[in-house]
Amino acid sequence: DLVEFGFMIRCANRNSQPAWQYMDYGCYCGKRGSGTPVDDVDRCCQTHNECYDEAAKIPGCKPKWTFYFYQCGSGSQFTCRKSKDVCRNVVCDCDFKAALCLTGARYNSANYNIDIKTHCR
């Protein structure tokens, strides 16, 4: 779910951007998105949105509200705990990949809270 995703971002990005700073970033972070992603951070969010779209095709799966378990270890090491529930596994994997992607992407504060009507066509 989105709350766990926020914690996972915090786990992966220790001493970096807080999760809330990704909620209104670029064309895809924190919103459905359209147009060309503004940078690598935004591309991570676009891919995450697409992953959630695929997860939503699993009967009964609601990715934004599906709780899962993961373990945050030392450093920025974290893993999804496998479940018998396919939806939970897929959603955790979506969030895991996005958190890793965000770790490797350079955050540009100029892309926070941009005018999507101008920049996201």
UniProtKB/Swiss-Prot annotation:
GO terms under biological process: arachidonate secretion; lipid catabolic process; phospholipid metabolic process
A single GO cellular-component term on record: extracellular region
Chief location category: secreted
Alphabetized UniProt keyword annotations: Disulfide bond, Neurotoxin, Presynaptic neurotoxin, Secreted, Toxin
Cleaved signal peptide residues: none
Location(s), subcellular: Secreted
Superkingdom of this protein's organism: Eukaryota
Pfam families listed in its UniProt record: Phospholip_A2_1
Record InterPro entries: PLipase_A2, PLipase_A2_Asp_AS, PLipase_A2_dom, PLipase_A2_dom_sf, PLipase_A2_His_AS
Organ and tissue specificity: Expressed by the venom gland.
Gene Ontology molecular function, alphabetical: calcium ion binding; calcium-dependent phospholipase A2 activity; phospholipid binding; toxin activity
S-S pairs: 11-72, 27-120, 29-45, 44-101, 51-94, 61-87, 80-92
Family note: Belongs to the phospholipase A2 family. Group I subfamily. N49 sub-subfamily.
Function field: Snake venom oligomeric phospholipase A2 that has potent presynaptic neurotoxicity. Chain B is not itself neurotoxic, but it is essential for the neurotoxicity of textilotoxin. Subunit B possesses a very low phospholipase activity.
Complexes and interactors: Heterohexamer. 2 forms exist: 2 A or 2 B chains, 2 C chains and 2 covalently-linked D chains, and 1 A or 1 B, 1 C, 2 covalently-linked D chains and 2 differentially glycosylated covalently-linked D chains. Textilotoxin was originally described as pentameric.
Protein name, UniProt field: Basic phospholipase A2 homolog textilotoxin B chain
Protein's organism: Pseudonaja textilis
